[in-house]
Amino acid sequence: MPSTPSFVRSAVSKYKFGAHMSGAGGISNSVTNAFNTGCNSFAMFLKSPRKWVSPQYTQEEIDKFKKNCATYNYNPLTDVLPHGQYFINLANPDREKAEKSYESFMDDLNRCEQLGIGLYNLHPGSTLKGDHQLQLKQLASYLNKAIKETKFVKIVLENMAGTGNLVGSSLVDLKEVIGMIEDKSRIGVCIDTCHTFAAGYDISTTETFNNFWKEFNDVIGFKYLSAVHLNDSKAPLGANRDLHERLGQGYLGIDVFRMIAHSEYLQGIPIVLETPYENDEGYGNEIKLMEWLESKSESELLEDKEYKEKNDTLQKLGAKSRKEQLDKFEVKQKKRAGGTKRKKATAEPSDNDILSQMTKKRKTKKE
């Protein structure tokens, strides 16, 4: 660890702003990387996201992870949100493939409990060509089984962007799965801001932002809200594209992140950046942006010249990308209106997910 971290953690923030960190060279390094980036929470992969089977942790590495958490004041039960592998699909109608997913899923949960981690983020998967309701029941059955086979880790289901037959593109999907879970203290929800917007839930204005969270509370309930993934969206509302953008440069804009930094119901849970950066400096700067937004009242910010300048600058930086995605979206809309057939998407990760971002990081920071 350098004698002085690149970004100093805020000791006064009510919000656990953080980012997805690399665990290259040992899972304990994710803690050090989080500290040096100024994170108050963090995410990481528990093992290689490209392989079904990875070497188990040594006791030395487990002890080092726990020691680092204690040294840098992270509570692994509440501040760490590992991300599950993207190819885990417990809703797969092919039971052989679903069982293979379950083995990798259970390996992740066991790793969490070895490290003392209390939260685990999971993409709910895809029903593919199966019956939607039957596959939701299958997913819930696997989750119930996993909960019985582990001791304390909470499974946090992430909402999705709406492509193909992905589970979790609607809040109702998540409600139905939660309704089938026997021990509800072991299940939660992570709301991804990009996925939410892409799935057709408008959160870009004060009115629609508040309406979404009211709907979330009515359908699911705030008691299940366990984490947030913080991303802007390159694609327009309802595009069903999982395209993460840097904060303020996408269709959400800085106003949404201002509202997040003043939402009481988001206090005390991991709020984790998954924006497209090739190194951790970008994450550190965005954490400081969120803490700056938190430090001023909303009324002050709306009258603040610096706030307006930041908004204008960020929107200009993302203008080209937004225009490209809008053009693609409009072409697809015209094809749909004309009855052109299109292939259904499956639960494969998008080109802009965390895995691809971590791959880019390897070009600048060898893992």
Swiss-Prot record:
UniProt binding sites for Zn(2+) 3: 195, 242, 244
Keyword entries, A-Z: DNA damage, DNA repair, Hydrolase, Metal-binding, Nucleus, Phosphoprotein, Zinc
Cofactor: Zn(2+)
Keyword DNA damage: yes
Matching SMART domains: AP2Ec
Taxonomic placement: Eukaryota, Fungi, Dikarya, Ascomycota, Saccharomycotina
SUPFAM superfamilies, per the entry: Xylose isomerase-like
Sequence segments annotated as region (Disordered): 312-367
Cofactor note as given: Binds 3 Zn(2+) ions.
Record-given protein name: Apurinic-apyrimidinic endonuclease 1
InterPro entries to which the protein is assigned, alphabetical: AP_endonuc_2, AP_endonuc_F2_Zn_BS, Xyl_isomerase-like_sf, Xyl_isomerase-like_TIM-brl
Bias (Basic and acidic residues) ranges: 321-332
Functional description taken from the UniProt entry: DNA repair enzyme that cleaves apurinic/apyrimidinic (AP) sites and removes 3'-blocking groups present at single strand breaks of damaged DNA. APN1 accounts for > 97% of both apurinic/apyrimidinic (AP) endonuclease and DNA 3'-repair diesterase activities.
GO molecular function: 3'-5'-DNA exonuclease activity; 3'-tyrosyl-DNA phosphodiesterase activity; DNA binding; DNA-(apurinic or apyrimidinic site) endonuclease activity; double-stranded DNA 3'-5' DNA exonuclease activity; phosphoric diester hydrolase activity; zinc ion binding
Misc: Present with 7250 molecules/cell in log phase SD medium.
CDD domains in UniProt: AP2Ec (cd00019)
